Design a protein with these regions (language model features):
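Extracytoplasmic catalytic/substrate-binding loops of multi-pass membrane glycan-assembly enzymes
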Residues: 10-25, 34-49, 53-58, 65, ...
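Hydrophobic/aromatic-rich transmembrane helices and adjacent perimembrane loops
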Residues: 31-32, 260, 267, 281-312, ...
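Transmembrane-helix motifs of polytopic, lipid-linked glycan transferases
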Residues: 57, 61-85, 118-123
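Short helix- or helix-capping micro-motifs
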Residues: 90-96, 143, 147
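Membrane-interface transmembrane helices that cradle and orient dolichyl/undecaprenyl
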Residues: 120-135
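Transmembrane-lumen/periplasm boundary regions of multi-pass, lipid-linked membrane glycan transferases
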Residues: 157-258, 269-275, 279
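Membrane-proximal, lumen/periplasm-facing interface regions of secretory-pathway glyco-
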Residues: 281-282, 286, 311-370, 377-395, ...
Length: 475
């Protein structure tokens, strides 16, 4: 509990800005769309809701809740397979897997998937053992929500289907239950499919454009880079078990069905990404696998003889305590001193509060109307928007299609505020039309903002331009 509280509080206290994925998700969720140009919508809806309820700390609370819920599902599954003490240890030792610690300071679609993966696996285990209608219906809803969170959940769904077909559980497909669950999952996912159709498959077009912009010569060696990253992710867990002489490969303590289930569901999805990368020679992002490994600790603890486990519990907890203390200390030090050590700000070191205050003060000295939207440099725009008292909409500079809630008519009626780093003005949708509009008053200027986290760095110089409807101008 103390660990989770620290990881909720320390980023709020020690960082001066959000990491990239947090303000991006918040501004998406602010618009309550059925989809966005990078991802499906569910994660952003939840993130924005926590931001509205809990304020600036909301994303950090949500992220740790996702990790904690993942641990709960691992415990529930483990308690069906091993003793309850072992299940508890297996659950808390998920925190000895790197992906479930450091990356969680940045809530994103990977973190959002973690409890969904663990929950789906647990529900599937219950289905295999009880085959009730209620379980299949819950599975369908959660699978649909998973697909609304990130498309990579399809790897888990594929693994579940494959496992059922390769084992005696294939008889389940002879009943109506899995087919109804499939239809229910598609029903939950269908609003996003309709949105994709209406927006010319925007998300897939974005993914394609990103892949075309990168060099993708066939290179099977990138698969081993991915594999090495995954193995290194388990090092804290493996080291703790080795130091306590608790790393065993004894498969006699599990019945065959449970053993097959654990190993397949716990390892195959991550290995599947390796196989795809090896065959296609494409670079799989390491973090795509982050929700896939929640059962690894349960697998390893299930192999420990009960007598050995009973003798080593205290040492195991001590090892975990050392690891969690160390990673928490490193996290806090990085947030507080990282920019000074590197002489370069990370995304967490930007003067978000000052940027936001400058925008608000500047706008309200010129306009009597609320600031409806902000645009310009994407990073600066989302930083400013997500720290304001009344959050405005954000319009991406990249393409009109990336911000379908913004139209020329809205901009002409409400105006806009544009900001960018000096000398780096991006191409901004509709800007040329706004500059010709006689009903808008155009003001511009420049700010110089110090880097509190990197005091020796030259100040951040921001240029801005405001388009204010004439009926809103201060007299």
């Amino acid at each position: 509990m103390i660990y989770f509280l620290l990881w909720m509080i320390l980023p709020v206290v020690l960082s001066s800005s959000y990491a990239l994925d947090i303000p991006e998700g918040i501004y998406w969720g602010h618009e309550w769309q059925l989809g966005y140009y990078k991802h499906p919508p569910f994660s952003s809806w939840v993130l924005y809701s926590f931001y509205k309820i809990f304020g600036y700390s909301g994303p950090y609370i949500l992220s740790q809740m996702c990790i904690a819920l993942t641990l709960v599902f691992v415990y529930l599954l483990g308690s069906k397979i091993v003793s309850k003490p072992k299940a508890l240890y297996a659950a808390i030792f998920v925190l000895a897997i790197y992906y479930y610690t450091w990356p969680s300071i940045e809530f994103n679609h990977n973190v959002a998937q973690m409890p969904i993966w663990a929950g789906l696996i647990y529900i599937f285990y219950l289905i295999l053992n009880h085959n009730r209608w209620s379980l299949w219906l819950i599975f369908g809803v959660v699978a649909g929500i998973g697909m609304l969170t990130k498309y990579t959940v399809v790897f888990l769904i594929f693994s579940i289907v494959l496992f059922s077909l390769l084992t005696p559980y294939r008889h389940l497909w002879l009943s109506a239950k899995p087919w109804v669950a499939t239809l229910l999952a598609l029903l939950v996912f269908s609003p996003h499919l309709w949105w994709l159709y209406q927006h010319d498959w925007l998300t897939f077009n974005y993914i394609q454009s990103r892949s075309e912009s990168t060099d993708h010569h066939y290179n099977p060696l990138v698969a081993f880079k991915y594999l090495a990253a995954q193995v290194s992710n388990f090092l804290p867990l493996l080291i703790i078990l080795l130091c306590n002489k608790s790393l065993y490969l004894n498969f006699n303590y599990l019945n065959k069905n449970d053993r097959n289930f654990l190993f397949f569901m716990g390892l195959f999805p991550g290995i599947l990404l390796f196989i795809i990368s090896l065959i296609a020679g494409i670079n799989i992002k390491d973090m795509w696998a982050s929700p896939m490994w929640s059962l690894v600790a349960l697998i390893l603890f299930s192999l420990i003889p009960e007598s050995v486990f009973n003798q080593r519990q205290r040492g195991l907890i001590k090892g975990l305590w050392i690891w969690l203390s160390l990673i928490t200390l490193v996290m806090a030090s990085y947030l507080q001193f990282g920019g000074q050590i590197r002489h370069k700000p990370s995304r967490l070191d930007w003067p978000q509060q000052q940027i936001s205050q400058k925008v608000q003060q500047q706008w309200y000295t010129m306009s009597q109307c609320p600031l409806d939207n902000i645009t310009g440099d994407n990073w600066l725009a989302i930083l400013a928007a997500t720290k304001m008292d009344q959050m405005p909409s954000v319009m991406m500079s990249t393409s009109k299609s990336y911000s379908p809630w913004m139209t020329l008519s809205r901009l002409e009626q409400k105006g806009t505020f544009v900001l960018w780093e000096k000398g780096k003005k991006p191409e901004i949708p509709y800007l040329s039309e706004l500059q010709k509009n006689q009903n808008l008053v155009i003001q511009q200027g420049e700010w110089s903002i110090a880097w509190d986290k990197v005091p020796n760095k030259a100040p951040l110089v921001i240029e801005w331009q405001a388009f204010i409807p004439k009926h809103c101008t201060q007299s």
